[in-house]
A protein has these predicted regions:
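Residue-level detector of anion-binding/catalytic polar loops
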Residues: 62-63, 125
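N-terminal flexible segment immediately upstream of the FAD-binding catalytic core
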Residues: 1-55, 59, 71-102, 131, ...
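FAD-binding subdomain of flavoenzyme oxidoreductases
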Residues: 93-97, 106-153
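Short beta-strand segments
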Residues: 67, 87, 107
Length: 153
């Protein structure tokens, strides 16, 4: 099995890497959890590509670890037995901002920076986590249960 060749066949060139520097960054986070370095990182752009990656992983008995931000806190994205990081950063579209009902629909890779800028243009704002990082995805903060702040008057 040639991981890079197989995954490049799914996502196209430029969206799969086995670069040591990139992969080493996934072997730990801000927690005390121990882990190992993944074999590769792949960055799909469509749900069809994600589906094909999952099918490939099942056929090759390869663990997949989904991520959507560069920073993690609780060990949830550290590979325990190698595998492939599925980086969802390219899913960074804001699908809808509903100013009447006050909600948004976003992709898993949308960062706080992108969301707050888009909402500001609409005269809106979002309740942020206690210590937001502009490059961290909104989805990651919600999945990792980051505490949000609420103004009380």
């Amino acid at each position: 099995m040639d991981i890079l060749k197989d995954l490049t066949g799914i996502t196209g060139a430029g969206f799969v890497t086995d670069d040591e520097t990139v992969l080493s960054g996934y072997a730990s986070d801000l927690s005390f959890s121990a882990g190992t370095k993944p074999e590769a990182e792949v960055c799909p752009d469509t749900t069809e590509e994600v589906s094909r990656i999952v099918k490939w992983a099942n056929e090759n008995n390869m663990p997949l670890i989904p991520v959507s931000s560069p920073v993690h806190l609780y060990g949830s994205t550290i590979p325990k037995q190698g595998g492939v990081i599925v980086n969802m950063r390219r899913f960074d579209e804001i699908y809808e901002i509903d100013t009447v009902n006050r909600f948004v629909r976003i992709g898993t890779g949308v960062s706080w920076e992108k969301l707050t800028a888009a909402l500001r243009e609409q005269g809106m704002r979002v309740i942020l986590p206690l210590t937001p990082r502009s490059d961290r995805s909104v989805a990651t903060d919600h999945l990792e249960r980051e505490v949000t702040t609420s103004m009380v008057y």
